[in-house]
């Protein structure tokens, strides 16, 4: 038997594809018949002039295989009725790969202070220790590795964070396991580094408080821009 699916492992992508099973029959004659058995299915082919043989297994039959070791068998029969059988093991591994990205900057918002600092990207995966995680932010790839618990993290330098504009960005993390199964996860973060601006209205109409206005009491009013509804304002008294 030749190697199946490139590495004798059928991963989640290959599990949905047709596969070619092939090999070489030593000492066989042209036209000798081979029967390939995979589970309860059989496929028939013949040996060519070079002793080689191959058979296509449809995607529907491959996708019916369950995870674990599958033993393929090839039985060749010559013109005199003599037969010989060889086996070959293939592993089916379609286990799902899990990957997450944690909240960024505590609230998924990069404010003015945080825009001048390093940014930690982190998350979890079900992959073994030292698995490579590729993380992309603003078109730049960063590499992290999983620890023994599946946690991963990587630091985006302050220079790259400060280069971000005022916009929403998507962090994309991706991982591929040792048999080619892959997964990706995304997480959005908002860059909002515009500082609030406070404008005070004229106090008492003319910024002069006379005796009558003192007795009546006055309300301090104004407007705040670059702020969201519900943001808290604070009054500080200066002077007597």
Name each region found by the language model.
Residues 1-4, 78, 84-102, 177, ...:
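Flexible, low-complexity linkers/stalks enriched in Thr/Pro that connect modular domains
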């Amino acid at each position: 038997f030749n190697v199946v699916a490139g590495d004798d492992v059928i991963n989640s992508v290959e599990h949905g594809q047709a596969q070619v099973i092939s090999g070489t029959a030593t000492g066989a004659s042209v036209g000798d018949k081979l029967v390939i058995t995979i589970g309860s299915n059989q496929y028939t082919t013949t040996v060519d002039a070079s002793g080689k043989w191959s058979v296509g297994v449809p995607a529907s039959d491959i996708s019916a295989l369950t995870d674990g070791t599958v033993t393929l068998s090839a039985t060749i029969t010559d013109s005199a009725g003599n037969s010989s059988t060889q086996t070959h093991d293939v592993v089916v591994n379609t286990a799902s790969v899990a990957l997450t990205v944690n909240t960024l900057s505590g609230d998924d918002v990069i404010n003015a202070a945080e825009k001048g600092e390093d940014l930690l990207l982190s998350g979890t995966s079900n992959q073994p220790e030292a698995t490579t995680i590729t993380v992309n932010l603003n078109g730049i790839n960063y590499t992290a590795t999983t620890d023994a618990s599946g946690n991963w993290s990587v630091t985006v330098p302050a220079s790259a964070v400060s280069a971000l504009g005022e916009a929403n960005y998507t962090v994309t993390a991706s991982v591929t396991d040792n048999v080619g199964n892959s997964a990706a996860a995304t997480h959005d973060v908002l860059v909002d580094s515009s500082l609030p601006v406070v404008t005070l209205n004229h106090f008492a109409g003319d910024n002069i408080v006379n005796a009558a206005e003192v007795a009546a009491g006055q309300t301090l009013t104004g407007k705040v821009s670059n702020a969201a509804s519900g943001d808290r304002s604070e009054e500080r008294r200066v002077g007597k």
